[in-house]
Amino acid sequence: MANVVVVGAQWGDEGKGKVVDIYTEYADEIVRYQGGNNAGHTLVVGEEKVVLHLIPSGVLHAGKRCVIGNGVVLDPEVFIMEVNRLKAAGRLEDDSTLLLSESLHIIMPYHKAIDIAREAKSGDKKIGTTGRGIGPCYEDKIGRRGIRLMDLIDPVAFSRKLRENLEEKNAILERLGEEPLGYNEIYRTYQDFAEILKKYMADTSLVLSKSVAAGKKLLFEGAQGTLLDVDHGTYPFVTSSSTCAGGAATGTGVSPREIHEVVGISKAYVTRVGSGPFPTELLDETGEKLRQVGGEFGATTGRPRRCGWFDAMVIRYAVRINGLTGIALTKLDVLSDFETIKVCTGYRFEGQELETLPAKLETFENCEPVYEELPGWKVDITGVRSYDQLPENAKKYVRRLEELAGCPIVMVSVGPRRDQTMMIKNPFGE
């Protein structure tokens, strides 16, 4: 029996949704532990593309319990829309398997209004927020002003907390040049949401602990990526939650001792959305080629992603921070049309080789990547179903990345569909 965490090993958008979808077959329960609807997991089921922003990818597998933990911030409207869309598509016939932590925090209209207004006034210092209120909601959580799901379904508590928050938030909005928000409409709308959400509410920490005691296999689904972690990422160009494997414990109330395997998801190259340092970024036709061939446009925002060569410094950092036991390598097929492929093996700053990623932003922004060049394979590999059938140069590329990462590659993906995946080792031990 193993409980497995899946984390992004780069700056997000690595293909976690597909990997989680595949691992779900071996898990009993799938748990989302951080972030909000700023994340988008794209899955291809048959010929159908499914994009999920809040609900764990395991929802596409009948009978699997899906849990949204206390570390998540939830936009009720988005959650309800996602549930209804899944039901209409015949993907969620029994929603009793879907649980929400009573302790998760609720995204309010003022969070979104403040998020958008701040970003608009940031000029060239934009973080690249999605404008969905994620950061301001986490601010209220840390500031002990937040509204939790248990508060939302208590009309008296919700009314009091809403009035207190509006007094403060409207003052902020007015300073930002925005119109204040009214109490009545928000109260009525969110009480309607509460009527729908209360059926899903549970003490999910207790539920999950009982599942562990009963020998159930848990799969923890992370959002974003290691380099977007609020503590360990490229601060301040990060998200507002703990995206690393440690967040799986704090974001669910499951003991860290009950986490046995951590799989980091990495593209065979690197992408990033929004601002922030990116040493291997390609601003030429090669970067544009990666973007077009890889379909590198955000599932949540549609924004074009910045693209660059594989960065072993980033992956080694992710291995160390998360305690990765394996790497799932995605989008290897995107590199099939390159004569040669570069891999960043290290950084130089002011002539000195760096041992690890620099914590100081100004240093990171001015790092010079050290590259080695590997031969490409110039063969379409999207139809390959066995690792041994990959072209020799593709296997050499995978082996070199494994050496540089210091961690075994346990899965290779050569396309968006489930069947375009080669599982070298199953973290659930099956």
UniProtKB/Swiss-Prot annotation:
Its cofactor is Mg(2+). The active site is at D13 (proton acceptor), H41 (proton donor). It is an enzyme of class 6 (ligase). Keywords: Cytoplasm, GTP-binding, Ligase, Magnesium, Metal-binding, Nucleotide-binding, Purine biosynthesis. It catalyses: IMP + L-aspartate + GTP = N(6)-(1,2-dicarboxyethyl)-AMP + GDP + phosphate + 2 H(+). Pfam families: Adenylsucc_synt (PF00709). IMP binds at D13, E14, G15, K16, N38, A39, G40, H41, T130, R144, Q224, T239, R303. GTP binds at residues 12-18, 40-42, 305, 331-333, 413-415. It comes from the Bacteria. One of its GO terms (molecular function) is GTP binding. Its EC number is 6.3.4.4. SMART domains: Adenylsucc_synt. The keyword Lyase does not apply. One of its GO terms (biological process) is 'de novo' AMP biosynthetic process. One of its GO terms (cellular component) is cytoplasm. Plays an important role in the de novo pathway of purine nucleotide biosynthesis. Catalyzes the first committed step in the biosynthesis of AMP from IMP. Homodimer. This is Adenylosuccinate synthetase.
